[in-house]
Structures are given as C-alpha cells and as structure tokens.
C-alpha cells in the first residue's frame, strides 16, 4: 500500500492527538477504562478542593492542592494522548486507503451476454461504480480501473495492484483458479476480464479495511479483558486500603496527641500513585498499535482478537510451495518405465501438459522440446480435451482419441490405473522412491492403462527458512509442513527445511482434520490459504491468514488478509502477535513494580507528623512531605509519556521460550520498574526544592 511513513511523533499525528486528548475527557469515554476513571474522579475532587482553598477553607495550601490537581489532570490527559496517538496512526493509514476510493465507472453487461472471446463481446452500459450491486457483471479492459470487488468469470488480464499492496510488479488474474479475485481500485494493464461483483457498495475490501483500522470502538481482546479485571481488582484493594487510612489517621492523632489527620488531597494522591495507572493508561494504545503494526506489514486483521491469538499460537501449518520452498518447481529429468523410451515418455508428458498453465506444466513442455525437439501442439487441433487438476483427483491431463492421458502424484495415478483395470509396475514405484529420496517431486505419467514413467521436478528450499523455524521452536511453536507430495519427498524436504512434522498427500479434508486434532489437545493453530478449497480449514483455524490474490471465499473465511499474498508472512504475523503480548506483559510488570518506590515516597510524608519514626522509610531523603507527595504524582504522570514510544513500537522481539522470557521480563522491567521511580522521584524533588 503506497503511503508516506509517519514518524512516531510527527506533527500530523501529535496535533490531532492533543485535541483528542481533551475530547476524551468526556465521562462517557473515561468510564470505559475503570482504573483511569478513578484518576478522573480524583482529578475532579482535587479541583473542588482547590476551589474551596481559594476561599480560605482549604485543608492545605492552595498551591499544594493546585500542584496535585494539575498533575492528576495531566495523568488523565497523557493516557488519553497515548490512545489518541495510536488511533491517529490508524486513522492516517485509513486516510491513505480512502484516497484510493475515486469516482469509477464500470462497463456493465447482462449475465446472459458473457463473452467467450474479446471479439464477441456484447454492448456494455457505462454506469457509476456506486450503482453496482452484488451479482452484477462488468467488463474491464486495458487501462480500466476495476470498479468493484469481484470474481473473474471469463478472460485473463495483467492487473496493477500497487495501490493496495505497494508492489509494483503486475499480477495475473484469471477465471477458474485460485487467482480469480480482483479488488476495486486496482487497474487492468493488459487484456480483458469479465467480473462478477461479490459485494454491495460500502462492503468492498477497501471499505472494510478503512472500517477496521479507524474503528474507535475497538473490541477488547480476551487477554486484555483478563488484564483489565486484574487491574480493577488491584484498584479496588488499594481503594479500600486508602479509605481506611483516614479513620486510622484520625485515631492515631487522637491517641498520640500530636500531628493532624491525613488530608483528602494526600489520600487521593496516594491512591492514584498506588493503583496501576501506567499500564492502565497505555493498555488501549498497545492494542491499537498492535493492529497498526500488522497493517504496516501489509496484513489487515479483522480485530485485535486475531492479532492477540497470533501471539498465543502453538502450531503453524505451512504450505510447502511458496512458503518453505521457492515454489517454482522445474522439470529436470524423464525416467521412463520398462518398455518405454525416454522420448516416448517426454512426448506423452508434453501432451498431458499442453493446456497446463502452471510453472510445472510449462517446464515439462519446455524440457521435452529441449531434450527431444518435440514441438508444442495446439490442443484443439489434435482433438484433445483438457482435464484440469483438482485437489481431489490430484491429476491433470487430456482425453484424446478415446484415451486418458494423465500426469499426477504416484498414488493418484496408481488409483486411476487400477480403476481402469491396469497394473502399476514395481520399477516405477522404485523410480518414484528414488526421486523422492533426492528431495525432488515425482510426477507419474500414464496413457490409458499404461504407466509411461516419471517426470522429476526439482524444488528449492528458501534460504534462511531453517533458522526461522529454529527461532519458532525456541518459542515453543511447532511447525508442520503441508504438501501434496508423497511421503518420501515430503520427508526429504521437511528434513532439509527443519520443520517439526509434515502432512504428505494432503487434501482439504486432511488439513481440517489436522487443525481439529491440535485444537482438541488445547493448542492454537495458525495457517495460510488462498483457494476456495482452503476456506473450511481457514474458518476452523485460530489465526487464518488469507492471501489477497486468493478467492473471495478464502478471504471471507480468514481473520487476516495479507495484501502481499506472501505465505511466509505467517511467521511475521506470529512474531507481531508475540511482540504485542510481550509489550503488554512487560509494561504491566513495570507498572506494578513502580508502586514500591511510590510507597516509600508518600507513606512517610503522609504520617511523619504523627509518627516521626516513619522518617526512617524516607530512604530517598526527600526535602519535605509536600514535595515528596507532589514528586510522586508528577513521576506517575510523566512515566506514561516516557513509555508511549515503547507501547507504540513494542518491546524488542526475542525468540525465547516462556521461562526465558519471564526471566528477561522480570530483570529488565521488574527491576527497572523498582529502580526508575527512586531515581525519577528524587530528581523531581530536587527540582521542586530549587524552585
């Protein structure tokens, strides 16, 4: 997606965020965050106490109450600012998407007039894209902007999707395959396609993207809800504790005959400093930023729930082709069966591949031409009928002169031959095993009931993929390779790539069964898919990343869409989810650890007049009780601002196991949360004493 990269504190983001910070002071917005709502109420109470002090009836000096009041309001505003800044980044992304929506016209045709070729195209009616409805059909030719999301039902065209994906390389969109989905706002570069509209106005992919990224009423994720409950429970505990301090203070003064009861302003300051305001103020920003980071990676998540689930994933199902291997298998050798010459095998293999537009099919045609000078033939001129590949048959080929010529997986061809009453030779099975053990893919070719031999397809594992899988393994994530190859080929590639397990000769039903098996054992499963046959498994998976180049059914079944249509992106999705959970956990640890230092600052200051012995707890040697309280309140507010970059950017991602992550978290953010307030409060106290 083409967009200018904004800095974290870019003026375009900061100015609206400041305005939104004040707009969010509305009680209807504040009560959604229970912890910060307590600070909000405390700010109102101290404001009333300050107004009272102006008339000479205050419990403390008006300047002290004013200082506490202002910094309590700043605490609320800083939390609002963190959330508004995160939302602002999403809104900026939505604005760039909205810029893609331009006035577009469509060449609408009647359903009965779908052309088989461009020369026979019917007359079309020029209508505005806003008039198109689900089920309508339009034609798009070179230089036309595709008017709406839809499925290609005829033709093939080169399409520029850079407006959506940011990738300048054009993509091919054609009918009848897994690359039939087109997106409104993209442009046809060459040839023509007939498109059936799959959405109504306002429901397009871009509309849904805009809605997802700028939706202010973001649904809380389960972990976020659980953490909120914990924070509310802590707040209630501290509220009860602070509420008991007033009668305790009054009793202590009466019993000791010295000092004065604790002031309401001090109690409010103590409560605000003790409750977990840091994480409460940043919690929403962390969630929004997580979705924003996904979008920066060109992945659109339907909800924060999907991003969070990615962080909890235990099992990754990865398609071999395009994810683990480069996906451009090339024919490299012909292994003829007994009684068949290599040239005869090449001839039949080429016939089976004439109408096969896959890279593998085209490479077979080219290899036959290079090795034996077998020229390509026009499939219609030789009276052949193409039989396309399906996930169920796992074969393709042609029917010609009453004979079935097929190529496909060994098990599929064996089943096909035996169904026709033929015999599958043992030497061919041995050739299949030999090819598989080399890590190549064997395609068996047959003519009628006769097995002609094996075509060897070489596959190349992506560089660095083994190291990525090792990182995932350290994090406790199990990787499973999904492939249609036979078990020997799958085992060879799985060993080379370093995956934990593999599923060979996989059908859509096998994928679905595997997902359900792992889920029944309490694991979360992530997978990618692009075809209609992937839709059931995508719908079942906890994290389902659909390819933007895939079918409409796949995109509707998934809870994320990868605009780059890169299956390897699933690993990045999981890492981003992990980073969001790590950030939330780290800042929660830091926030709770903060309370210890604030306790040493405020408790002695609040009761030292009554109990001078408490001066021993003033380990920071703060200059005065009022300065100590004010310093703690100021630090409590400023730490939110200082942690905003960490909340938005996320903590540094490390591929570690749960125990190692916990140790790292406690060392950096637990110990850091203990030490930082002692230093910060002391520095602020020194500044106040100078002023």
From Swiss-Prot:
Topology in membrane: Multi-pass membrane protein
Keywords attached to this entry: ATP-binding, Cell inner membrane, Cell membrane, Ion transport, Magnesium, Membrane, Metal-binding, Nucleotide-binding, Phosphoprotein, Potassium, Potassium transport, Translocase, Transmembrane, Transmembrane helix, Transport
Residues annotated for ATP binding in this entry: 356, 360, 389-396, 407
GO cellular component, one term: plasma membrane
Coarse class of the protein's main subcellular location: membrane
InterPro entries: ATPase_P-typ_cyto_dom_N, ATPase_P-typ_P_site, ATPase_P-typ_TM_dom_sf, ATPase_P-typ_transduc_dom_A_sf, HAD-like_sf, HAD_sf, P-type_ATPase_bsu_IA, P_typ_ATPase
EC number: 7.2.2.6
Pfam family, one: Hydrolase
Domain of life of the native organism: Bacteria
Enzyme class: translocase
Localization in the cell: Cell inner membrane
Transmembrane segments: 35-55, 64-84, 225-245, 266-286, 600-620, 628-648, 671-691
Active site (record annotation): 319 (4-aspartylphosphate intermediate)
Molecular function via GO: ATP binding; ATP hydrolysis activity; magnesium ion binding; P-type potassium transmembrane transporter activity
Catalytic activity: K(+)(out) + ATP + H2O = K(+)(in) + ADP + phosphate + H(+)
Residues reported to bind Mg(2+): 530, 534
NCBIfam families on file: ATPase_P-type, kdpB
The protein's role, per its UniProt record: Part of the high-affinity ATP-driven potassium transport (or Kdp) system, which catalyzes the hydrolysis of ATP coupled with the electrogenic transport of potassium into the cytoplasm. This subunit is responsible for energy coupling to the transport system and for the release of the potassium ions to the cytoplasm.
Family to which the UniProt record says this protein belongs: Belongs to the cation transport ATPase (P-type) (TC 3.A.3) family. Type IA subfamily.
Record note on quaternary structure: The system is composed of three essential subunits: KdpA, KdpB and KdpC.
Family annotation (HAMAP family): KdpB
Protein name: Potassium-transporting ATPase ATP-binding subunit
Organism per entry: Polynucleobacter asymbioticus (strain DSM 18221 / CIP 109841 / QLW-P1DMWA-1) (Polynucleobacter necessarius subsp. asymbioticus)
